[in-house]
Amino acid sequence: MRTTEPRRRKIVLAVTGASGSVYALRLLEKLQQLKSPPEEIAVIFSDTAREIWEAETGQRYVAAFPAKEYGNKSFYAPFASGSSQFDTMIICPASMGTIGRIANVTSDDLIARSADVMLKERRRLILVPREAPYNLIHINNLKSVTEAGAVVCPASPSFYSNPKTIDDLVLTVVDRIIDLAGFESNGFRWMEND
């Protein structure tokens, strides 16, 4: 009897110009440390995201295996096509400008194009907005992407794990994103951790 190994996952992580780069940093670190990590992590920065990343985290982003960085104007990236094997895209943090372009199918950069591909192919698209408060345009755009199949997971930390540090709070959001992406996370679970 022949057994087949489970397919290793390929995901896209897009970082946009919204504040909250620490969520993306911790997400990337945690994805690489999973018991069954993704086979490949494609990383894309929007035009202002790298600048904000460096200002907020105090460090430059350098891709390390299994992560590979793609330019936001690089439409020849494999996941810009529905024929690719990338099955999940996470936009974290997701600026309202990016969400608006996705909601209105304005595929003018690799992030918006890849999100469009995920939606049209019925694959996982997780958007992590950090903005607050929302105006009516934001709410309508969030409604549109949700109706199209995206999961909107606001960067709202939970407190039932009794977090002690900012990083503890960040990890409550990161663990939720990892769960939504279909990976096994070892994060705190309500009424399961003593």
Residue ranges and their predicted role:
Residues 1-126, 130-194:
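A cross-family phosphate/adenosyl-ligand binding-site feature
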